[in-house]
Swiss-Prot record:
This is Probable cyclin-dependent kinase 10. Residues 7-293 form the Protein kinase domain. One of its GO terms (molecular function) is protein serine/threonine kinase activity. Its EC number is 2.7.11.22. ATP binds at residues 13-21, 36. GO terms for cellular component: nucleus. It is an enzyme of class 2 (transferase). GO terms for biological process: protein phosphorylation; regulation of cell cycle. Induction: Up-regulated by Pseudomonas aeruginosa, PA14 strain infection but not by Pseudomonas aeruginosa, PA01 strain. It comes from Dictyostelium discoideum (Social amoeba). It catalyses: L-seryl-[protein] + ATP = O-phospho-L-seryl-[protein] + ADP + H(+); L-threonyl-[protein] + ATP = O-phospho-L-threonyl-[protein] + ADP + H(+). Belongs to the protein kinase superfamily. CMGC Ser/Thr protein kinase family. CDC2/CDKX subfamily. The gene is cdk10.
Length: 366
């Protein structure tokens, strides 16, 4: 087993619940990697934390183009720490949303979503639930590839479904059954999270932002309408339902108001992902086949997905002026991809205008 001294630390990427991630360079090969330093708490003195053991075990067993690859495990310089060495991708989707300050194009969202669904379909077919799907765990490379990361909370499941700890998924992406204390859950919890991610990509901010579990479930009820036993049999028997006081009598689904401009087909997929009853929630396999992906605009090809400048940790804290410079860079980059088409359209517009001075002004739309 190699030592972390085999790598040169380049930059700090971020810190999660179960590890600190840095950008590094392999001194032998020159390859750029991501180094995840595993947090070892007081209870872990005698070994590697269970979350890290699960992550290592699962990542060694799976291989998919839309799942981040674990390259190796190395020991710390003093021998009492371990580092997980991953392939490096330049961005995570949450940082892109925060720094671009504008929603992605629908064709780009379709490309993102398809790649995510394929990764999750693969996991579920291998009896694995990720349990922590969120935009910050979706890595994006400037080659257009999206890869699912952070398997610290992932675990295998079986049939019949056994009891599993419900408080795993990050609050804003947590499904109603988990918020209400359901312990016998399965792959549907990941699909709710994907619905939350889909909504976030559409509106450019997290979809439902509760302050705690009770606030989160109340916000869900306000957005999607209060559930009942007819649409979600058994929900009122879940452990945490009795903790809810003053449930708003709000029978209407208001989700459409958040995304008024998307097509009915797009809204149908979003609605099926954010379905109360987990047994009726759409699966990853069925979502991939949804008509949303077969209507205009079609999913952007990976090769034509936009490239973004590297967002360092310090960059994320820069002032508004610098952030606007970043936005201009992105907009110029995306504009240049279709520059010739835009020029041709503008030329045609000018020709038509000059041919007939009595015509109404011809408005050019990008």
């Amino acid at each position: 087993m190699r030592s972390v001294l085999s790598f040169e630390k380049l930059d700090s990427i971020g810190e999660g619940t179960y590890g600190i991630v840095s950008k590094g360079r392999d001194k032998e090969t020159g390859r750029i990697v991501a180094l995840k330093k595993v947090k070892i708490g007081q209870q872990d003195k005698d070994g590697i934390p269970l979350t890290s053991l699960r992550e290592i075990q699962i990542l060694k067993e799976i291989k998919h183009p839309n799942i981040v690859s674990l390259l190796e495990v190395v020991i710390g310089s003093t021998g009492d720490k371990i580092y997980l060495v991953f392939e490096y991708l330049e961005h995570d989707v949450a940082s892109l949303i925060d720094n671009i300050n504008k929603p992605f194009k629908l064709s780009e969202i379709k490309c993102f979503l398809l790649q995510l669904l394929r990764a999750v379909e693969y996991l579920h077919s291998h009896w694995i639930i990720h349990r922590d799907l969120k935009c910050s765990n979706l890595l994006y490379g400037n080659n257009g590839n999206l890869k699912l990361a952070d398997f610290g909370l992932a675990r295998k499941f079986g049939y019949p479904i056994e009891s599993i700890t419900p408080c795993m998924v990050t609050l804003w992406y947590r499904s109603p059954e988990l918020l209400l204390g359901c312990q016998k859950y399965s792959t549907a919890v990941d699909l709710w999270s994907i619905g939350s991610i889909f909504g976030e990509l559409l509106i450019g901010r997290p979809l439902i932002t509760g302050n705690n579990e009770v606030d989160q479930i109340m916000r869900i009820f306000n957005l999607l309408g209060e559930p009942n036993e007819q649409i979600w049999p058994g929900f009122s028997s879940l452990p945490n339902f009795k903790r809810l006081n003053n449930i708003p009598h709000q029978p209407y689904n208001n989700l459409r108001e958040l995304v008024p401009t998307i097509s009915d087909t797009a809204f149908d997929l979003l609605n099926q992902l954010l379905t109360y009853d987990p047994t009726k929630r759409i699966t990853a396999s069925d979502a991939i086949k949804h008509p949303f992906f077969y209507e205009n605009p079609f999913p952007q090809s990976i090769e034509m997905m936009p490239k973004f400048p590297t967002i360092s940790k310090s960059f994320k804290n820069q002032n508004k002026k610098q952030n606007n410079n970043f936005n201009n860079f992105v907009q110029n980059n995306q504009t240049n991809q279709n520059n010739q088409t835009n020029q041709n359209n503008q030329t045609n517009q000018n020709n038509k205008t000059s041919q007939n001075n009595n015509m109404d002004s011809y408005k050019y739309s990008k």
